[in-house]
Amino acid sequence: MIKTIKKSNGTVVSFDPERLNKWASWADKRGIIWSEVTMEAMKRVYEGCTTKEMHQAMIDVCVDKQTQEYSDMAGRLLLGIIYKEAFGGFTKVPTLVTFVKNMERAGLWEKMDYSQEELEYLQGYIVHSKDISYGYAVLKQFRDKYGIRDIKTGRLFESPQFMFMGMAMKAFEKQPKHR
């Protein structure tokens, strides 16, 4: 029985099964029995595991089921990890202006010829909620192959929406200003 769990910031807290149930309930939008997923995931982790390991155990349970419904749940759970790694969670997604400046400052994106006004305009075309419609296989490919991440730690720095916008911005950067 798990009594403690280590949060992403390194603090050890008492394990609250209700939080696990909330993750599963949020990720299940196809009517599967998510409590089975949480119970099986609990069997796969150890006392003092990290929240990320617990989250991954839930994903692994879903992937092992090999049905579309469970794959969709795995995708939503993986998206939670992606947003946690990149931004600290779904509620902490930066604006495009802030994101671009941070990526350029960190040397992860090349400096592009866009004004703040243009970036603010492009912000209106980013719909982060679209990411939730991607299945597990798509998000796994994004995370493992295409998203910008730290080679040493594996930490991801962008979401699918920001990656797509960055590709479009780079492709059209040299176009006339009447974009």
Q: How would you describe each model-predicted region?
A:
Residues 1-179:
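Extended catalytic cores of very large enzyme megasubunits
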